[in-house]
Amino acid sequence: MHLDSLVAPLVEQASAILDAATALFLVGHRADSAVRKKGNDFATEVDLAIERQVVAALVAATGIEVHGEEFGGPAVDSRWVWVLDPIDGTINYAAGSPLAAILLGLLHDGVPVAGLTWMPFTDPRYTAVAGGPLIKNGVPQPPLADAELANVLVGVGTFSADSRGQFPGRYRLAVLEKLSRVSSRLRMHGSTGIDLVFVADGILGGAISFGGHVWDHAAGVALVRAAGGVVTDLAGQPWTPASRSALAGPPRVHAQILEILGSIGEPEDY
């Protein structure tokens, strides 16, 4: 039996579960109850409630355990595991921005084989199974068309110029400077999952993520690949749950951005 024949019914079940979670997502917009600090990040009561609801429903319906952003779960390299971000773009969500989403990926032995991204405030619901196509609101989409970096929008992760870590702020500024010399159409949406699904949908021509959280990436990686795009880390290695960054785009744009990144030097030099 082909993998897609196993996965497609799971995606159908998961879609109904995310539809059911949408009401709670909408009610909590502009939520201001930060319940836990995680560096500069936080969760709201709505994050926790959505994760509890979706996890319980997924396990009951599919028999597959869930690794969630807020409560964790089984290892992401398990035979089968759902990976959930109940609200991607939590700061946007709490501030009242519509750029927030529910992200759900299905991993098989650590490989994203399905992705679902729900954007309740603007209506799009995206799904895909490995091999494609991308499906938007129930309608199959054409494969991604390739393009030139100079002609497309590029999503870039948000940051502080004074931040440290694996990708210091000064390195990220260097990335922006180099990219802007080729494309003046850089965008910061404050949601990795939205950046990735926008690449899959052809809204963005590329996206750079300086983060390594699997729940931010699993769904979008599946969607981009299903649409015909490429997703690697910033060094050009295929994205895996252990990756600490991501670069997504159609093949030509991906290669052009990767060449620019290679010209900047190593992050630790900054």
Swiss-Prot record:
UniProt-listed GO biological process terms: inositol biosynthetic process; inositol metabolic process; phosphatidylinositol phosphate biosynthetic process; signal transduction
Catalysed reactions, semicolon-separated: a myo-inositol phosphate + H2O = myo-inositol + phosphate
Residues the entry annotates as binding substrate: 69, 87-90, 187, 216
Enzyme class: hydrolase
Coiled coil: none
Deleted gene: phenotype: Strains lacking this gene show no difference in colony morphology and no differences in levels of phosphatidylinosotol mannosides (PIMs), lipomannan (LM), lipoarabinomannan (LAM) or mycothiol (in the absence of exogenous inositol).
EC numbers on record: 3.1.3.25
Induction: When comparing gene expression levels of the four IMPase family genes in exponential cultures of M.tuberculosis, the level of cysQ is the highest, almost equal to sigA; impA and impC are expressed at approximately 40% of this level, while suhB is lowest, at 12% of the cysQ level.
PANTHER family reported for this sequence: INOSITOL MONOPHOSPHATASE, INOSITOL-1-MONOPHOSPHATASE-RELATED
Name of the molecule in the record: Probable inositol 1-monophosphatase ImpA
Annotated organism of origin: Mycobacterium tuberculosis (strain ATCC 25618 / H37Rv)
